[in-house]
């Protein structure tokens, strides 16, 4: 098969590259069909052997990356279907249009790998360049490190334990090296089997010790399951608020809080239809749903007004409300979603996708906060959790809190892929992570990424879980992306030194 792929030319080669990239997307959450990479990556290497120049390699890589991200990011079109009469015409354009520039990062990696000699030098060079371009994708423009190759292992805690050392980028490097081995022959594949067994053994050894004891806090994750179509309707504000209040009161009554402990309810991103930071009446209702000593951490819009009473700025925020209705603290989202929370190039783009008449403003971040004496945590709103190294190193928290509204994406792969990034952040930082999602998937992970409890997609209810204790400082938390960056650079250098080749 690989020999036939290497012989393809012209459009057939491009179609094959596109198909292999699309196939590779099945390795991503929630399918996790990792064996397809044993065809998709060696197939790409085979097609690369037939490329007559680095420019041809660039086009082949673009076709592979385009197919990969069209399939992997298909769920983005669901957000447009929440208002089909207004945005339905964008459905056939949005995903291919987004997938093309993202696929360009893979294209550049493939073009770089073309200069390496076929065989193991090219595989190593491809893996190194690929990971370097993944890192660049995580910071370029506003950054979009979604569906990184290392996330294919996030279906369970055991396969991702290496992220505590090398992060998800390091897992990407290992994944690409292992996936490309079939192109190198049976001996290489046998070595790959041994490597996988060794990695599994490492993961099992890291999971063997007992977790630190839980903290004296019981988290109550509240999942209101409010559909996006109803979320901002004026006539639904009170029913939605009432639903969250009732779920909180019922969950608090049923929760088993140990003596000396306290209950902390968590609502998802923008779950409150009212502005909790400035609406004292809404906070009074919240206080009535909390037990004595309890607290609510809720997603709520925060507004700033000028001296003339005119609205000046809006923030996508997390608000901490005490059982006495006092506002104990706020966090304003720092990493905003382009086109979702603000319009980039506003003067040049004639259409407006964001809701409302004003863009959201960004706050400072990342931060650690400890309202009302809670164990310090790092709040991550929505896709802030997809960025590795999302914890401030100067004020290391004791846990991570991710609140999100994935109702935009319905029953698609999007919420599952988002959840996978949360597991990876817990392992990388060695910190427990709690996640409250509007329509799911709400969950609690311990400091090694083991899921302790969850509410599934489309469920309505609450989940009471003791807050796990923090783990030891991981090498990745200590050093950050410098470890995977160094590994990727060494791989690229090794592949280059093994096969210095004249540029054609």
Name each model-derived stretch.
Residues 207-482:
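Soluble catalytic domains of enzymes that build or remodel membrane lipids, polysaccharides, and related
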Residues 1-207, 411-412, 422-425, 437-445, ...:
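Membrane-embedded alpha-helical bundles of multi-pass enzymes
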